[in-house]
UniProtKB/Swiss-Prot annotation:
It comes from Paenibacillus barcinonensis. Residues 1-23 form the signal peptide. It is an enzyme of class 3 (hydrolase). The active site is at E104, E197. GO terms for cellular component: extracellular region. GO terms for molecular function: endo-1,4-beta-xylanase activity. The gene is xyn11E. This is Endo-1,4-beta-xylanase Xyn11E. Belongs to the glycosyl hydrolase 11 (cellulase G) family.
Length: 210
């Protein structure tokens, strides 16, 4: 969520789940995320398969996306954003949470007028691009476990991903790079989604995830 506008989720389908040994993980989506803080108008459509679309106007904060009920560090996310057109603040991002420790994380491939930043930690090369690594902190803010204090981990692409082409996020590359900076994720994985998020903006998005 935007670091200046954190919110609660409408539906959290994921339960705590710990993993020992992981293999690279792909597969059909099984989780639909559709949350808004009630500001403005957000029209989200849960399409067939891994497709979703959202049109928004003069919103507060919202997040819409498709993904997986149970996360994994080995997730390989494939997607095609046929449309991603924010007017104002918006992200096209791989997004999720861990517990033990409670951490919120992002891999941001595209954005609107605001490119997220934080405390700079370095870079990681992945999937044909270079990402800047940042951390931020949230103090007594809503989370998947109620109001808590927790870090956010970010990988933000230096240049925006092209729209309308098949794209891939190899999450393990980011997990490894974060760990090399002392940014260790938790041992219990909640949901993961390829999301469109907006804050005080308008726009449209149409994304297929697999």
């Amino acid at each position: 969520m935007f670091k200046f506008g954190k919110k609660l989720m409408t539906v959290v389908l994921a339960a705590s789940m710990s993993f020992g040994v992981f293999a690279a993980t792909t597969g059909a989506t099984d989780y639909w995320q559709n949350w808004t803080d009630g500001g403005g108008t957000v029209n989200a459509v849960n399409g067939s398969g891994g497709n979703y679309s959202v049109n928004w106007q003069n919103t507060g904060n919202f997040v819409v996306g498709k993904g997986w009920t149970y996360g994994t560090p080995n997730r390989v996310v494939n997607y095609n954003a046929g449309v991603f057109s924010p007017s104002g603040n918006g992200y096209l991002t791989f997004y999720g949470w861990t517990r033990n420790a409670l951490i919120e994380y992002y891999v941001v491939d595209n954005w609107g007028t605001y490119r997220p930043t934080g405390t700079y930690k370095g870079t990681v090369n992945s999937d044909g691009g270079t990402y800047d690594i940042y951390t931020t902190m949230r103090y007594n803010q809503p989370s998947i476990d109620g109001y808590s204090t927790f870090p956010q981990y970010w990988s933000v692409r230096q240049s925006k991903r092209p729209i309308g082409v098949n794209s891939q996020i190899t999450f393990q590359n980011h997990v490894n790079a974060w760990a090399s900076k002392g940014m260790n994720l938790g041992s219990s994985w909640s949901y993961q989604v390829l999301a469109t998020e907006g804050y005080q903006s308008s726009g449209s998005s149409n994304v297929t995830v697999w």
